[in-house]
Structure formats: structure tokens, C-alpha cells
Regions:
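Terminal peptide-recognition signature
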Residues: 21, 39, 57, 70, ...
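Short active-site-adjacent helix-start/loop capping segments
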Residues: 30, 63-67, 114
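Crotonase-fold acyl-CoA enzyme core
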Residues: 96-197
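Conserved CoA-thioester-binding segment of acyl-CoA-metabolizing enzymes
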Residues: 1-58, 95
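Amphipathic alpha-helical repeat scaffolds
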Residues: 32-33, 91, 109
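Glycine- (often His-adjacent) and acidic-residue-rich active-site loop
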Residues: 59-93
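Catalytic-core regions built around general acid/base machinery
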Residues: 42, 89-101
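Short glycine-rich anion-binding loops that position phosphate/pyrophosphate groups of nucleotides
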Residues: 26, 61-63, 110-111
Length: 197
């Protein structure tokens, strides 16, 4: 089922009890709130679908895996109610992933920032390429990575989470693999896809 709008898209295909859930957005696969809501709903639907055993979560294109939440929407937040609504979008996705009754495998082909790192951490098993660098840049814009912290800390530990939060430089895919975020890292997307199939 394809769910499309000007704020990005979701596409779900089911074959041999494997659901492939692909998201995309022109701004480096970032998530406006409407796309976060659709992703939450689709994860809940797949969790309840008896025809599905495994979910492969991936993003479109060959660039970034996910640039996190929509920066334009963040800049538009002007009060506490809007802030709560904005940050709840990613929290709802991460909770849907955590509560999902299916195994979620992340196919990580490129860079991830902020909420994108949270999505990777919420996957049960994440496979990546050497291009799949990660970064938490929240402090650089005056906020903390509070929404994704529980998921990321569970996956890589408090020490690595603190390092990522305070040292906002890019971390390599090998670093992420050593910390437990990625189960395996491949040299190419073709090798990544061969492992998944």
C-alpha cells in the first residue's frame, strides 16, 4: 500500500511474510509530522497483521537514510503545546517500534542524524553500509536528544550516548557497529541488499 502526499511517502509491500516498509522525503528523508503519524499507524497495522513475520524498514534513494524530524516544522514551533505535539511524533514512532510484535530489520544505506539515529536504535537488527555515518546534532541547535535517548541508550549504552550527545561530530559506521547500533557493516549497498535477501 502506498501512502503519498507532498510531505513525503510511505510504501509497504508484503511478500513471503516479509513486509518492506519504505519511507522517503525530498529533504534527506526527514520526517514532517504527518509522515511520522503515518509511519506510526503503519507500524501498528503491520504489528497486527498475521501475514507478516518480519518488517524491513528502509528509506528511499541513495543519499541519507534519515535526517530526523523536519527542521522547518521545528523552526515553526512557537509555544509549549506545539512543542509537545512536534516531539510526540518521533516518540510515537519509537514506541510503535518498541511495541511491535514483529522483528524490525533496519536497512541503513546512508547517513542518519538525530531522530534517524533513534529509528535505527529502535530496530531489532540494523544492517548498514560504510556510508552510514551517524550524528546527534541537537545540542548545536539548543535542544537535547531527549526523545530518542532511551532507545539509543538501550542499544549502545549510556557512555556512547553521552559521547554522541556532547561530541556532535560524525561517527563512522564502524564506530556504530562497535557500539552495537549496527549488527553488520558492508562496503556497498549491493552487499547490504544481498545479506538482507
Amino acid at each position: 500500500m502506498a501512502l503519498q502526499n507532498p510531505n513525503g511517502f510511505l510504501l509497504t509491500t508484503i511478500e513471503n511474510k516479509i513486509a518492506t516498509l519504505e519511507f522517503g522525503h525530498p529533504a534527506s528523508n526527514s520526517f514532517p509530522s504527518v509522515l511520522l503519524e503515518r509511519l506510526t499507524n503503519e507500524l501498528n497495522n503491520l504489528s497486527n497483521n498475521s501475514a507478516v513475520l518480519v518488517i524491513i524498514l528502509k528509506s528511499s534513494g541513495s543519499g541519507a537514510f534519515c535526517a530526523g524530524a523536519s527542521f522547518d516544522e521545528l523552526l515553526a514551533v512557537s509555544n509549549q503545546e506545539e512543542a509537545t505535539q512536534f516531539f510526540s511524533g518521533f516518540a510515537n514512532v519509537l514506541n510503535a517500534m518498541r511495541n511491535c510484535s514483529k522483528i524490525i530489520m533496519g536497512r541503513i544505506h546512508g547517513k542518519a542524524v538525530g531522530g534517524g539515529v533513534g529509528i535505527i536504535a529502535a530496530c531489532d537488527y540494523a544492517l548498514a553500509t560504510t556510508e552510514s555515518t551517524i550524528k546527534l546534532s541537537e545540542l548545536a541547535i539548543g535542544i537535547g536528544p531527549f526523545v530518542i535517548e532511551p532507545a539509543v541508550s538501550r542499544k549502545i549504552g549510556k557512555s556512547a550516548m553521552t559521547e554522541m550527545t556532547l561530541d556532535t561530530e560524525w561517527k563512522s559506521a564502524i564506530w556504530a557497529n562497535q557500539k552495537g547500533l549496527y549488527a553488520k557493516v558492508f562496503a556497498t549497498t549491493a552487499e547490504l541488499d544481498a545479506e538482507i535477501m
